[in-house]
Amino acid sequence: MRRHAAFTLVELLVVIAIISVLVAMLLPAVQAAREAARRSSCQNNLKQFGLALLNHEAALGYVPPGARMKFGAAGPQIGANANVALLPYLEQAALNASWDHYRSYWEQESIVLATPVPLFTCPSNDAQTISDQAFEDVGVPAGLRLATSDYAFSRGATDAWCLSNEYPSHENGLFHIVGEGFADVTTLQQISDGTSCTFAIGEAAGGEAWTVCTLPGCTAPEGRSRADVPWMVGNLSTAEIAAAGYPFTGIYGTTIEPLNKRPVTSTLVDNAGITDCRSSVDGGTDATSNFRSDHADGGFFLHCDGAVRFIGESIEPAIYRGLSTIAGDEAAP
């Protein structure tokens, strides 16, 4: 009787072991390839931001302000941030048409506020594209859902909320608040440090992995918040929110704190001193969050010439801060 050839148990185990070794060898390469693709997509997002900024400046003669502020009977009102002004230049015509530019961001339709923009999301970040953090304890309507962004506008080497005519600062970045009593809009011609040596936008990862702590230099996470950044908010008036246990981050980043600092420093606007534009090192009471990314060892930054470069965590603090200012007169790195 003829016997059919077959695998023995030992041979089968050897084959399984070989396959397991091959999978173990290939898996890191596959994961690395996927992360490389995510990094490339994140970098391309910032390049699109760069084109939008340059086109806005070419069309209107200035860079969109970080936000606009006006004072009324109800006190200071902080408008939407620069993302809203950039929508027409980011191929977001439909979303721009849905936005009521005569109303503040909190008066917009809820469906508009909850609309995520793919360009605002870095694929390496696993945060939600819509923040479900609840601020109703401090008067923000319950159930308000805000779509998020993984990118922040550069405030410079300062954590001050604003740039007052009374407190001009060589530490200022490209984006600041515009309104009566505050500095005027910024043009590319004002960047005396050179557009290729100046940050415009950097990464601002969010999600559960990025907890938040209060005040500059903090090291212990506090409250119930994570570093989610609503893409449209100029800034919430946040002293009450922080007091209620909701330290959170905003649409601006500063180099006064280290890149990828964890926990993330909260963004804080002190209502009582909202026109006091001093940084924390000058005795001010405000705070601005640090830049951070889910890429290993650094993060991507859009420069004012439209180029996107990866900045490592090991960068010298003085060089890092100098790259974020528009007229600090620092030596080029």
Regions from the PLM with identified roles:
Residues 4-38, 48:
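N-terminal single-pass transmembrane signal-anchor helix
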Residues 36-333:
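Surface-exposed loop/linker segments characteristic of extracytoplasmic
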